[in-house]
Amino acid sequence: MSILFSSILFSIATFFSRILGLFRDVLFAKYFGVSYELDAYFIAIMFPFFLRKVFGEGAMSSAFVPLYSEKSGEEKDKFLSSVINGFSLIILALVILSYFFPELIINLFGAGSSHETKILAKKLLLITSPSIYFIFLWAISYSILNTNNKFFWPALTPSISNITIIIGTFLSTKYGIISPTIGFLIGSILMFFSIIKSIIKHKYYFTIKHFPHFLKLFFPTFMTMVVSQINTVVDMNVVSFYDKGSISYLQYASRFYLLPYGLFAVSVSTVVLSKISNDRKNFNYHLNDALKTTLFFTIPSMVGLIFLSTPIIRFFYEHGAFTSKDTLITSKILIAYTLGLPFYGIYSTISRSYHAIKNTKTPFIAATIVSLSNIILDIIFGLKYGPIGVALATSIAGIIGVLYLLFSVKTFPIKDFLKISLNSLIMLFVIYLTDFTDNEFWFLIQILIGILVYLIFSSIFYRDLIRRFLYARKK
């Protein structure tokens, strides 16, 4: 099964989860708008969510998949037990830390927040902290399934968390922000139990024999992801010193930016990690294939989101407590974020490819460059322009990081990039021609027209990618 076809299966599952996530945020906008309660919620879930990003989409899979795929029989079971036993102790310490020193974590993600926001966030953090352990177990199960080239169901499991949070949000009219917070915890538990079979089929050993060896590969990838996620910490802290609700603005806008990123960039990078881990001799072939696929989806997504940002935000969010002013601010933030979409797609693909061949140094240097650039640019743009400046800083930092990675890997499908860019510009021109009404539903028609035009011209100028997809599907 090709990278393209595997990525599309992954994307279908991710799309369902992201749509539920979008519906969840629509409900947030309706019930909470841009408020200190929602800011407190985002701060409280950021610690477990931060670890989920590190474990689920980064260090855990990047270190676990190559080592796990090398082992067989009893050694595979002992390796899995070692990782679970070793990390259980570490995560227990993190949970205890969050219970006894919640102020440290609150200040880590929202130092500039108001007193009432911090007080509420502290209460909510006590609810979300236990989810860390279940997120870790989910990440292990997720990695095992990916190693066996099973991508669809693992990618679908985050939908469970979105569903429980949605239920909690509906109950918020009676219980307030507490109910979606409890929904977050329940969702984390159910996510693990939905794929627990991949772990329990292995024989358990009371050992940490392989854990030190695993840490040698995990620690550099972990530090790479931590450095990458520092951007999120810095972003939230900078906007927390801005107007009340700025954290909420940032989260609302990032939802639409992360939709195509999760659908395409994360999907491709997850698949290419497994492909290269099992076929390292063809590193360049798999990397180029992955880059083409990433560009094929992220460039038109960027173009469409930039042009249609305002009608998209208005349609989904401008209800209840969310005002037209909020729409204008959020759409500008979305544009600033979206400028970096293709670059973060390339960044993710190349970084995971390096991890597959156990090269952790290059991704770490790239992550450090991105993080330092983001911190400097946050200070320059964020403190002056608030969440819009923070989003722009994120995009520019991603571009800088990609330039370093491209210089390092010395390969890039430039001809494919030009073809895809041309097709995307043609798509944009057609969307522009159809922009003749203020009907709030019309942008949906424009999206469908844009997709159709893009696919038609891609079939003319980019036949090889379409042909490879059809061939992979037949296989």
From Swiss-Prot:
It is found in: Cell inner membrane. GO terms for molecular function: lipid-linked peptidoglycan transporter activity. It comes from the Bacteria. Disulfide bonds: none annotated. GO terms for biological process: cell wall organization; lipid translocation; peptidoglycan biosynthetic process; regulation of cell shape. Changing N231A: Does not affect activity. It is a multi-pass membrane protein. Pfam families: MurJ (PF03023). Its main location: membrane. NCBIfam families: murJ_mviN. Involved in peptidoglycan biosynthesis. Transports lipid-linked peptidoglycan precursors from the inner to the outer leaflet of the cytoplasmic membrane. This is Lipid II flippase MurJ.
